[in-house]
Amino acid sequence: MGGGLMQLVAYGAQDVYLTGNPQITFWKVTYRRYTNFAMESIEQTFNGQADFGRRVTCTISRNGDLAYRTYLQVTLPEINQQMLPAGVGQNLASNVLGSTTPGANNKGLEYGVFARWLDFPGEQMISMVEVEIGGQRIDRQYGDWMHIWNQLTLTAEQQRGYYKMVGNTTQLTFITDPSFAAVDGPCATTAPTQVCAPRNALPETTLYVPFQFWYCRNPGLALPLIALQYHEIKINLDLRPIDECLWAVSSLHNVCDSAATPTKVATAYQQSLVAASLYVDYVFLDTDERRRMAQNPHEYLIEQLQFTGDESVGSSSNKIKLNFNHPCKELIWVVQPDQNVDYCASLICGTTLFQVLGAQPFNYTDAIDVLPNGVHAFRWTRICXKDLMHSSPQLVFLIRLAQLMQSLSLVGEYDEPNFEHVSLGSASAGGGFFPPASAASSRANGGAVDFQSAVSDAGTFVLTETSLDMHCWGENPVVTAKLQLNGQDRFSEREGTYFDLVQPYQHHTRSPDTGINLYSFALRPEEHQPSGTCNFSRIDNATLQLVLSNATVGGTNTAKVRVYATNYNVLRIMSGMGGLAYSN
């Protein structure tokens, strides 16, 4: 008897639980037939010009029978060196470094347009977006929420593509430098075509931001336009001012005096969006299903987002009242120090946010991220200390980073042979930025030491690309947290790490960045199928008690607490109209 047959006849009482009265076979494929349909993505225009700091509305046209996935398509303007005001930066080198005759090769590299879009510009530019049916708001979401949700649900396979869709790339979020290569365009140009080349401008780029409304994430919840003959569907969009999306200064020198003080590049902040529109995936149904969809009433179990606004806190112990309704699947909260998002202070030389190249709207930790978005940070140069006063001043983006890290007690003095024990925080370090990537080596005037890049151009590109998802920031601002419902503890007090590590690990696809906290009432909150809720409509008093770290609210420091809740509701559609079954 063959071995396979021996296994086959080795059949006992326990096998009845596995193979008795079988219901499926692995040896004959089965499938189910589906209703015929077609799908097409069609552009929808806004009423009025969509631009930074404006509110625009798009009325969804009835091009198809159902409306499914919806994307914001927006084209960012180019930010280039021609935007530098005339006369800015003259004699900057001599004032900063004390040299009366800076080298000719330095001229024009002390000042320019140093600009970057803040992280995740596609998400950051969205202040608010909402869906209306017949004048009733059905759901409202925020760019901050989109970032948090994608931190929890985005798979590793999707991350690279999503980052490019929303503009979180080195081409857009890494600082420009006048010594870098020009932007490559579609027409004939002498600029390098390789994407790894650092650029002296932020290129005109089209972003695609997917909305996360209930009808966008599940085809079974697609909006039945054919059944809403008497109600219009509108999408209202609020865009942030450009000041909260862009960081652009005329110099990277961290020296404040009349000659060298960096200035805001006003022309860059006067730019408008090149284009903005929505793309909606329309579904076309076959005749029979189309008739049923139009004539029959419908009830959809939908998901909504609840957010009652920021709450300012300035002490370590806080009670946050939760004014939520409906059966909620989970609570998600972040605590963001105000110092992380001080957009005005980020343009003032000497401030921490200036040194790290702008505000950090998606930093939910209790410390500034001191790993800045700059190619310069990955190119180190050895140079004789005396040459700092007489040679090219294009040294110190990394030195300035080291100054910041030293001031934060992250590193000590830089002490290696031939450097003559120069403190990175000393005045002799001056200001400036690192040599261009094309500089292989050079002999400093009067010096005995060559300076040479410790990382190759290819290595620099690898480091910058991998650093997009790397951070040198703080810890979770939440030291402990506890939820109380009608005065009773829903769970015992837990450390903050339980809410930003254990809970996401248990209930979500992905472990998010530090500081994104959650507590889930559902087994699988990402799925539409309900798997557990807490009905906050039946809770009179819900309170989230938070103890925050000293780094977050110590001294005069303040922070904002944002608590989000995802809930179920019922959308009823009948007689050509639609509305919610349960209001707030």
UniProtKB/Swiss-Prot annotation:
Any one GO molecular function term: structural molecule activity
Alphabetized UniProt keyword annotations: Capsid protein, Virion
Keyword rRNA-binding: no
SUPFAM superfamilies documented for this protein: Group II dsDNA viruses VP
Top-rank taxon, per record: Viruses
UniProt cross-references to InterPro entries, sorted A to Z: Capsid_N, MCP_C, MCP_C_sf, VP_dsDNA_II
Subcellular location, record wording: Virion
Assigned GO CC terms: viral capsid
Pfam families: Capsid_N, Capsid_NCLDV
Family: Belongs to the NCLDV major capsid protein family.
The protein's role, per its UniProt record: Major protein of the capsid.
Designated name of the protein: Major capsid protein
Species of provenance: Chrysochromulina ericina virus
